[in-house]
Amino acid sequence: MPIQVLPPQLANQIAAGEVVERPASVVKELVENSLDAGATRIDIDIERGGAKLIRIRDNGCGIKKDELALALARHATSKIASLDDLEAIISLGFRGEALASISSVSRLTLTSRTAEQQEAWQAYAEGRDMDVTVKPAAHPVGTTLEVLDLFYNTPARRKFLRTEKTEFNHIDEIIRRIALARFDVTINLSHNGKIVRQYRAVPEGGQKERRLGAICGTAFLEQALAIEWQHGDLTLRGWVADPNHTTPALAEIQYCYVNGRMMRDRLINHAIRQACEDKLGADQQPAFVLYLEIDPHQVDVNVHPAKHEVRFHQSRLVHDFIYQGVLSVLQQQLETPLPLDDEPQPAPRAIPENRVAAGRNHFAEPAVREPVAPLYTPAPASGSRPAAPWPNAQPGYQKQQGEVYRQLLQTPAPMQKPKAPEPQEPALAANSQSFGRVLTIVHSDCALLELDGNISLLALPVAERWLRQAQLTPGEAPVCAQPLLIPLRLKVSGEEKSALEKAQSALAELGIDFQSDAQHVTIRAVPLPLRQQNLQILIPELIGYLAKQSVFEPGNIAQWIARNLMSEHAQWSMAQAITLLADVERLCPQLVKTPPGGLLQSVDLHPAIKALKDE
């Protein structure tokens, strides 16, 4: 066969083999494009796990009509223009091949409008030569990308897709990672017409712990130690779970970001593992959410087809910097910025600048680790023993770890380069309905809140009851039923059996499935909020309530169930309160605008302030 130039569609399909692994890969590429466009809100609609439809809609800057055809062409991008740009990448995308690759294995439609244009335009590519057609459309400022029938023309690739649930779980995980990277962006995820995730933008200076708790869970939030570690152009922020309380479930939380880009980096994982090795068992893994900021000239992100890995020009420096940052927090036992219990919190301590790991000129000189005397000994916190001084040398570790570490550090010596000016990112506004910031827990079940300088008290059990009612109230589709491992069989009277039969359709909408015979009823499934309840008590009470009713409305039954559920928490913690309020704000936004009686009470501090001033 003679050498020949491949047709554009075939070339794009070959490239898609690296870029488009599964529906989650498409979602990642398209959402990253939205973030690069300055979007502050991204709506993601998925159908059948992404095999049928992936729709990404944003409010970014949009694409000009004249550039729509180029947007679907290979190696066409607005992110870089020269080799110098490639050596200091600050955007998430830069290769200009994602849209072309995706359009070659799906039916892709791109609709966009810029603020300068009066109308929107729609583009799609088709045919062997991937000719682009552009036509007028209706669309607000921003961009919408629709990907239909993924892998429809490559049956072999489609055959390797997993079940709908598995593919959507991969998409969900990608969105979780992106939501942790950009707290300033609102992200909504829907599957088969149902909203699954709603991550509201966190205002500047707001509580990032709300989104952290929603994604990583309350258990991680309660054990999280905050990190703020800096030297020169290296900055490490985020949270690491206390290794003394790490569980197998927590160990699955390992999120790392380099200059805002999600990564799976062996060097970073090794540094964190080494810092925690004295407190972790041989089969345990650390849990962390960490953000590393580094001079873009000192990291190469163009080393992996899906951009999951990076290469640091000074691996030893980065490794030691992260190691020292995590180790210092574990030694000091710094607590998360939000107090997670009702005890008085010690005064905040100044976080020192790392001078042991960094050397003098950490980018221009080779990273040679010299013994350095400890320059700082952390002051003991109130009520705790003094923290150990900085270590002069790294502790020993296993031979296999050392071999991996040695291989990771075999990188060429860097060349001296001028520092690139830090990019000025446009401020992204984020407005959301909120009860405010949780200050502390009062009397075990009330949260003291602050919003715009106003103080209020919120009853957590009441908020929990409203949340349960929202979770139980069916919308356009019935509430999802959770099958019981051991069905519950109860004896009922004739009157109760008759009431159950009349209420069967209403109960089915609430996710309660049962079968009845002559004198018994067998509960086979209940909705998720009921799974942790004592059904031996709750279900007979529910049957008794139904026997007294003549009309069976799902909303009324959901309200009764919500009022009779036992609270999950006898003693509320800060983390639990933050998680609850985040869920209430997401599912019950009407409560924020018009709080019902018994939920929220304003607290007037003016008399107390006046009394203090009078003194």
UniProtKB/Swiss-Prot annotation:
Key words, A-Z? DNA damage, DNA repair
Q: Which SUPFAM superfamilies match?
A: ATPase domain of HSP90 chaperone/DNA topoisomerase II/histidine kinase (SSF55874), DNA mismatch repair protein MutL (SSF118116), Ribosomal protein S5 domain 2-like (SSF54211)
User: Could you name the Gene Ontology cellular component terms for this entry?
Assistant: mismatch repair complex
Q: Which Pfam families match?
A: DNA_mis_repair (PF01119), HATPase_c_3 (PF13589), MutL_C (PF08676)
Which family does the UniProt entry place this protein in? Belongs to the DNA mismatch repair MutL/HexB family.
This chain belongs to which protein, by name?
DNA mismatch repair protein MutL
Annotated function: This protein is involved in the repair of mismatches in DNA. It is required for dam-dependent methyl-directed DNA mismatch repair. May act as a 'molecular matchmaker', a protein that promotes the formation of a stable complex between two or more DNA-binding proteins in an ATP-dependent manner without itself being part of a final effector complex.
Q: Which gene encodes it?
A: mutL
Q: Which GO terms describe its molecular function?
A: ATP binding; ATP hydrolysis activity; ATP-dependent DNA damage sensor activity; mismatched DNA binding
Report which superkingdom the organism of origin falls in. Bacteria
**Region annotation (Disordered) ranges:** 378-397
An example GO BP is: mismatch repair
Which regions are flagged for Low complexity bias? 378-391
* Keyword hit for DNA repair: yes
NCBIfam families xref list:
mutl, PRK00095.1-1
